[in-house]
C-alpha cells in the first residue's frame, strides 16, 4: 500500500471518528450544558473506535511495520486503561452521590427520562468498549511486533 493511500485511509478514519464522537455528544451538549463528563465521554468514543480499528485493520494501517511505536503504545495503553477505569468509576460515583436525575432536573419529565437514559447508556457503552479495546490492543500489538520481527522488519 502506498504512503498516499495509507495517509488518506488514516485521515478518513480520523475524520469519521471525530464526526461520530461529536454527533454522539451533540444531544447531551444541547440539552445538558452542565454535563461534567464531556472530555471523558469524547475520549471514550475516540479510543473505542481507534483501538478497535487497530485491532482489526492493523495489517493495512501505517502502524504495521513500526515496531517500536507499537511497543511504546502498548506500555502507554496501560496508563490509559487506568485513567479510563478511574473516569468510568467517577461517572458512576457522581450519580450515586448526587442522585440519578441531578443533571436533568431542569428538563420536563419526558425529555428528562430520555436524556438520562441516553446519557448513561451512551457513556457506559463507549466506556466499557474503550476499556475492553484498550485491554485487547497491547497483546495484539505485541503479537504483530513478534510476527513482523520474525519476517525481517527492523524499522522504528
Put a short name on every predicted segment.
Residues 111-138:
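Hydrophobic alpha-helical transmembrane segments
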Residues 1-51:
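Transmembrane alpha-helical insertion/packing segments
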Residues 31, 91-95, 148-156:
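Transmembrane helix-loop junctions in multipass membrane proteins, especially transporters and channels
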Residues 85-108:
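Juxtamembrane non-transmembrane "cap" segments at the membrane-aqueous interface
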Residues 46-53, 129-141:
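Hydrophobic cores of alpha-helical transmembrane segments in multi-pass inner/ER membrane proteins
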Residues 69-92:
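Hydrophobic alpha-helical membrane-embedded segments
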Residues 43-69:
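Canonical alpha-helical transmembrane segments
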Residues 134-156:
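Cytosolic juxtamembrane helix at the C-terminal end of the final transmembrane segment
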Amino acid at each position: 500500500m502506498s504512503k498516499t493511500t495509507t495517509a488518506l485511509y488514516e485521515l478518513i478514519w480520523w475524520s469519521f471518528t471525530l464526526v461520530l464522537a461529536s454527533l454522539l455528544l451533540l444531544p447531551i451538549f444541547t440539552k445538558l450544558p452542565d454535563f461534567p463528563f464531556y472530555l471523558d465521554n469524547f475520549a471514550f468514543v475516540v479510543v473505542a473506535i481507534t483501538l478497535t480499528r487497530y485491532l482489526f485493520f492493523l495489517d493495512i494501517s501505517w502502524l504495521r511495520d513500526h515496531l517500536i511505536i507499537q511497543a511504546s503504545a502498548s506500555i502507554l495503553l496501560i496508563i490509559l486503561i487506568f485513567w479510563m477505569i478511574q473516569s468510568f468509576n467517577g461517572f458512576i460515583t457522581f450519580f450515586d452521590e448526587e442522585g440519578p436525575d441531578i443533571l436533568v432536573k431542569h428538563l420536563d419529565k419526558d425529555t428528562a427520562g430520555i436524556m438520562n437514559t441516553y446519557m448513561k447508556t451512551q457513556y457506559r457503552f463507549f466506556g466499557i468498549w474503550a476499556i475492553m479495546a484498550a485491554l485487547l490492543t497491547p497483546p495484539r500489538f505485541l503479537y504483530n511486533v513478534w510476527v513482523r520481527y520474525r519476517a525481517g522488519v527492523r524499522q522504528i
